A protein has these predicted regions:
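Central hydrophobic cores of alpha-helical transmembrane segments in multi-pass inner-membrane proteins
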Residues: 24, 44, 49-61, 71-72, ...
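Extracellular loop-to-transmembrane helix junctions
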Residues: 4, 33-59, 144-145, 265
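Alpha-helical transmembrane segments and their helix-start/interface "positive-inside/aromatic belt" motifs
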Residues: 11, 38-46, 83-102, 169-179, ...
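Transmembrane helix-boundary motif of multi-pass solute transporters/channels
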Residues: 11-48, 198, 236-242, 253-256, ...
Length: 322
């Protein structure tokens, strides 16, 4: 059976970048920045991304393209006789399963929030305390979280079952394009909020006083971890995408494009979150709850978004008890 390939180079780039872009950029990056002192962490993160993340990403793509096989079989095809590099393939697969245990859970939180927004749970004028209570109410309801996690898993199975071109590539083009437009619009809006200047100063200007209680060593390790985490390195994901690459483009150029797109989304996410934190009084070191408290504030206090929301979902709004 002939191995399926991507329909276009853009499809490969968006699917590969989509693997890297996601919860690690939109959810994890802002809260780790907040817990790690802001600007200095961002600077170290970019340094590690260029000096360590990009080279490892390129090497993983190289393993995939050279073998044209999945993780374990790829190592077996390339390793010298008597060596045991294929064992890393099994470790990578185990890592993927462990990663999905909480990736699907957090993705479920996000889907839950989407439906709460369109059904009117989040209303214009809600304050930070109300948004925080909504998040912790969700955490106290395991059945709700389990339901949305199940929805995410089933959706993933459906997409993957429709083959590479008709499933993963097609939906990645739509979702990635939508994500890029959305985060740019939200970033522009956040930059117009009162308090945006203080948020940008915390986010983009290194300040040693911000890390006095954290420790420079912890900030360095966190930045290094994020550089590897954000590119999905070490779990054979990029090796699998590399196995679908042709030889008409260089590994370094494709790796650079993936890394650049991933970094753009991460940095832009910070431009959304931190100005909003200082505007709405959200603690920047709030941890995993950061975007689930900040983004509802951004959306419900964004008149244009609210006007779009009402006509699209009038039935939900009308059925909401007063």
């Amino acid at each position: 059976m002939e191995r399926e390939s991507f329909q276009s180079r853009l499809g490969f780039l968006l699917v590969s970048a989509g693997c890297a872009i996601g919860i690690g950029n939109v959810w994890r990056f802002p809260y780790v920045v907040g817990q790690s002192g802001g600007g200095l962490f961002v600077l170290l993160y970019l340094i590690f991304l260029i000096t360590m993340g990009l080279p490892v990403l390129t090497m993983e793509l190289a393993v995939g393209r050279a073998s044209k096989k999945s993780a374990v079989l790829g190592y077996k095809a390339l390793e010298k006789r008597g060596s045991y590099w294929h064992l890393h393939g099994y470790v990578a697969i185990l890592g993927c399963y462990m990663l999905m245990m909480y990736y699907t859970t957090v993705a479920g939180w996000m889907v839950s929030y989407f439906f709460k927004f369109v059904t009117g749970t989040f209303e214009t004028g809600m304050d930070t305390e109300s948004c925080s209570l909504e998040f912790f109410h969700m955490l106290s309801n395991p059945k709700e979280m389990g339901l949305w996690m199940f929805v995410v898993v089933i959706a993933g199975f459906i997409v993957c079952s429709r083959s590479l071109q008709n499933g993963l590539e097609r939906i990645s083009k739509v979702m990635m394009s939508s994500l890029l437009v959305l985060i740019i619009v939200l970033a522009i809006h956040s930059l117009t909020l009162s308090g945006a200047a203080e948020g940008l100063q915390f986010y983009l200007i290194p300040n040693l006083s911000n890390i006095q209680n954290i420790g420079i060593g912890k900030v360095i390790v966190s930045a290094m971890n994020q550089a590897f985490f954000t590119l999905s390195l070490g779990v054979a994901a990029m090796e699998i995408f590399g196995s679908y690459m042709g030889r008409e483009h260089t590994l370094a150029s494709e790796g650079l494009r993936i890394c650049a797109l991933d970094t753009f989304v991460a940095i832009t996410s910070g431009l959304i979150i931190f100005p909003a934190c200082f505007s709405f009084g959200v603690e920047v070191n709030a941890g995993p709850s950061l975007i689930f408290v900040t983004l509802p504030n951004v959306f419900v206090n964004m008149p244009a978004a609210y006007r779009l929301h009402n006509p699209v979902f009038p039935r939900f709004r009308d059925n909401k008890p007063s």
